[in-house]
Amino acid sequence: MLAKRIIPCLDVTGGRVVKGINFEGLRDAGSILEQARFYNNELADELVFLDISASLESRKTTLEEVMKVSGEVFIPLTVGGGINSVERAKDVFLHGADKVSVNTAAVNHPELISRIAEKYGSQAVVVAIDIKKIGSDHMVHTHSGKNPTAYEALEWAHKVQELGAGEILLTSMDRDGTREGYDNDILARVSTSVHIPVIASGGAGNLEHLYEGFTIGHADAALAASIFHFRQYSIRQAKQYLRDRGIEVRL
């Protein structure tokens, strides 16, 4: 069985790490480089760097920041935000990213997923899916959660898999920053209906939530921010807790 991964996420805007609730009310969560160094030393399996205002502001991810982070970490680095072309993905890879995360641009131009996958391999393409419950449906949103789309979560997950995505980053906007736990219902439905890895995101508030994301949500990896940024728990603590509960992790 493949080891489950713990992935801290750096939501970045204005040159700082930030964290909000339900994609709103952002507060400062520290220096980008200090957080990156911390997670590199803390046995994080990977690191995600998301420029959360790039698509909203119709601009590109700051390559200088990506290069600085990539120079500080020796774990796989996924970069997202404003990646809307193969050329832009190339720039991000050249500045040290191991994977790119596409979201808004993938919805607007689904062929972008295939084009990046064909050039760099599916393993280098993460499709971020931001979902919000509307009625009984989990609807996909773009532009940092501002714009609803016509896609339902399962429908879009299947489509991105067919287009060549190597991984899905599934974020519940309803749970984001609430520390109430992942939305394990939709997480399990997506995870069990696709054959590519699914990363749980949005809502981790304690170590039991990570465990539930793996056991109830069937996630392949758990992404978290608040519980690690503000040092509520260390990643070493999280991994030991999971190992003690029978979850295979790298320690």
UniProtKB/Swiss-Prot annotation:
Write down the InterPro entries for this protein, in alphabetical order.
Aldolase_TIM, His_biosynth, HisF, IGPS_HisA/HisF, RibuloseP-bd_barrel
Entry GO MF terms: imidazoleglycerol-phosphate synthase activity; lyase activity
Instruction: Indicate whether Acetylation appears among the record's keywords.
Output: no
Q: What is this protein called?
A: Imidazole glycerol phosphate synthase subunit HisF
**What the protein does?**
IGPS catalyzes the conversion of PRFAR and glutamine to IGP, AICAR and glutamate. The HisF subunit catalyzes the cyclization activity that produces IGP and AICAR from PRFAR using the ammonia provided by the HisH subunit.
The UniProt family comment states: Belongs to the HisA/HisF family.
Q: Cite the annotated pathway.
A: Amino-acid biosynthesis; L-histidine biosynthesis; L-histidine from 5-phospho-alpha-D-ribose 1-diphosphate: step 5/9
Q: What class of enzyme is it?
A: lyase
Q: Which PANTHER family match?
A: IMIDAZOLE GLYCEROL PHOSPHATE SYNTHASE HISHF (PTHR21235:SF2), IMIDAZOLE GLYCEROL PHOSPHATE SYNTHASE SUBUNIT HISF/H IGP SYNTHASE SUBUNIT HISF/H (PTHR21235)
Q: What is its main location?
A: cytoplasm
The record's keywords, sorted A to Z, are:
Amino-acid biosynthesis, Cytoplasm, Histidine biosynthesis, Lyase
Instruction: State the Gene Ontology BP annotations.
Output: L-histidine biosynthetic process
